[in-house]
């Protein structure tokens, strides 16, 4: 399980490397969506199943609106890719090589604690059992969200629905 979290963390960083060296807004939005999905996978690996799914759905809904808006405003007939400019390609390759070097150092050496200190890993645990009893934070939060915050869900869903039509209207050019 540690290797899965380590691999997801590497993919998370690589998504942000792709975002930071974006040649066109289309690829920047794609990098953010990939990083969001991998980040939800990290939350899922620590036991926060419904919390990770809800975070991904809300994040993806908001990102699709922003992604559609930036694509509409910065439409290019021939968008630049990572390989079309030597400087952009060099920065992307440099970021990838730095991440690969860090991964090789962490896997091959015995002193992993030198790079990353895992003393407070209990702060990242979503599902934790004690002698008193177990209460799942994500299920209790979902119950509160649907019982007390039902109008908040309706307003949030309606806002995303209306914003999709706004983005469609902007892209149409009317």
Curated annotation (Swiss-Prot):
<feature type="transmembrane region" description="Helical">
    <location>
        <begin position="1"/>
        <end position="21"/>
    </location>
</feature>
<feature type="transmembrane region" description="Helical">
    <location>
        <begin position="86"/>
        <end position="106"/>
    </location>
</feature>
<feature type="transmembrane region" description="Helical">
    <location>
        <begin position="24"/>
        <end position="44"/>
    </location>
</feature>
<protein>
    <recommendedName>
        <fullName>NADH-ubiquinone oxidoreductase chain 6</fullName>
        <ecNumber>7.1.1.2</ecNumber>
    </recommendedName>
</protein>
<dbReference type="InterPro" id="IPR050269">
    <property type="entry name" value="ComplexI_Subunit6"/>
</dbReference>
<dbReference type="GO" id="GO:0006120">
    <property type="term" value="P:mitochondrial electron transport, NADH to ubiquinone"/>
</dbReference>
<comment type="similarity">
    <text>Belongs to the complex I subunit 6 family.</text>
</comment>
<keyword id="KW-0812">Transmembrane</keyword>
<keyword id="KW-0249">Electron transport</keyword>
<dbReference type="GO" id="GO:0008137">
    <property type="term" value="F:NADH dehydrogenase (ubiquinone) activity"/>
</dbReference>
<keyword id="KW-0999">Mitochondrion inner membrane</keyword>
<keyword id="KW-0520">NAD</keyword>
<feature type="transmembrane region" description="Helical">
    <location>
        <begin position="46"/>
        <end position="66"/>
    </location>
</feature>
<feature type="transmembrane region" description="Helical">
    <location>
        <begin position="151"/>
        <end position="171"/>
    </location>
</feature>
<dbReference type="Pfam" id="PF00499">
    <property type="entry name" value="Oxidored_q3"/>
</dbReference>
<keyword id="KW-1278">Translocase</keyword>
<dbReference type="InterPro" id="IPR042106">
    <property type="entry name" value="Nuo/plastoQ_OxRdtase_6_NuoJ"/>
</dbReference>
<keyword id="KW-0813">Transport</keyword>
<keyword id="KW-1133">Transmembrane helix</keyword>
<keyword id="KW-0496">Mitochondrion</keyword>
<comment type="subunit">
    <text>Core subunit of respiratory chain NADH dehydrogenase (Complex I) which is composed of 45 different subunits.</text>
</comment>
<dbReference type="GO" id="GO:0005743">
    <property type="term" value="C:mitochondrial inner membrane"/>
</dbReference>
<comment type="function">
    <text>Core subunit of the mitochondrial membrane respiratory chain NADH dehydrogenase (Complex I) which catalyzes electron transfer from NADH through the respiratory chain, using ubiquinone as an electron acceptor. Essential for the catalytic activity and assembly of complex I.</text>
</comment>
<keyword id="KW-0472">Membrane</keyword>
<keyword id="KW-0679">Respiratory chain</keyword>
<dbReference type="InterPro" id="IPR001457">
    <property type="entry name" value="NADH_UbQ/plastoQ_OxRdtase_su6"/>
</dbReference>
<keyword id="KW-0830">Ubiquinone</keyword>
<dbReference type="GO" id="GO:0032981">
    <property type="term" value="P:mitochondrial respiratory chain complex I assembly"/>
</dbReference>
<dbReference type="GO" id="GO:0045271">
    <property type="term" value="C:respiratory chain complex I"/>
</dbReference>
């Amino acid at each position: 399980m540690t290797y899965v979290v380590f691999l997801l963390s590497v993919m998370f960083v690589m998504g942000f490397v792709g975002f930071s060296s974006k040649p066109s807004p289309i690829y920047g939005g794609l990098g953010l969506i990939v990083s969001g999905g991998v980040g939800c996978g990290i939350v899922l690996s620590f036991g926060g199943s419904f919390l990770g799914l809800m975070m991904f759905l809300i994040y993806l809904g908001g990102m699709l609106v922003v992604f559609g808006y930036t694509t509409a405003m910065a439409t290019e007939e021939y968008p630049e890719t990572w390989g079309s400019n030597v400087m952009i390609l060099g920065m992307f390759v440099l970021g990838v090589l730095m991440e690969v070097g860090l991964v090789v150092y962490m896997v091959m050496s015995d002193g992993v604690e030198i790079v990353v200190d895992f003393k407070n890993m209990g702060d990242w645990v979503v599902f934790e059992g004690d002698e008193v009893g177990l209460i799942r934070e994500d299920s209790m939060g979902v119950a509160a969200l649907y019982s007390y915050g039902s109008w908040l869900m309706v307003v949030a869903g309606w806002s995303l629905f209306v914003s999709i039509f706004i983005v469609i209207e902007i892209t149409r050019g009317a």
